[in-house]
Swiss-Prot record:
The lineage of its organism: Viruses, Riboviria, Orthornavirae, Negarnaviricota, Polyploviricotina. The keyword Transmembrane applies. Gene3D superfamilies: 3.90.209.20, Hemagglutinin Chain A, Domain 2. InterPro entries: Capsid_hemagglutn, Hemagglutn_HA1_a/b_dom_sf, Hemagglutn_influenz_A, Hemagglutn_influenz_A/B. This is Hemagglutinin. Belongs to the influenza viruses hemagglutinin family.
Length: 100
């Protein structure tokens, strides 16, 4: 059993340097409004790696991200015709939304 746990710990440490984007979070009493709920208690987050576009996005576990382009997340979910080219997308690792 100890060997299995040691092996699992080694694998986790080996994969730990493969972070593409990430956030550091800690406990907080901050409340925010989300699309579906109001006054949700969340952890505060600090952007760790990416704060500007470098020309390419990392795939995570072999899945490419989905870039919304000129479409907003809300427009994509609500069916804005501007987002029609995203209809066939069924699998992605994370969502990239451009600031506008």
């Amino acid at each position: 059993m100890k060997k299995v746990l040691l092996f699992a710990a080694i694998i986790i440490c080996i994969r730990a340097d493969e972070i593409c984007i990430g956030y550091l979070s800690n406990n907080s009493t901050e409340k925010v409004d989300t699309i579906i709920e109001s006054n949700v208690t969340v952890t505060s987050s600090v952007e760790l790696v990416e704060n500007e576009y470098t020309g390419s996005f990392c795939s995570i576990d072999g899945k490419a991200p989905i870039s919304l382009g000129d479409c907003s997340f809300a427009g994509w979910i609500l069916g804005n015709p501007m987002c029609d080219d995203l209809i066939g997308k069924t699998s992605w690792s994370y969502i990239v939304e451009n600031q506008s």
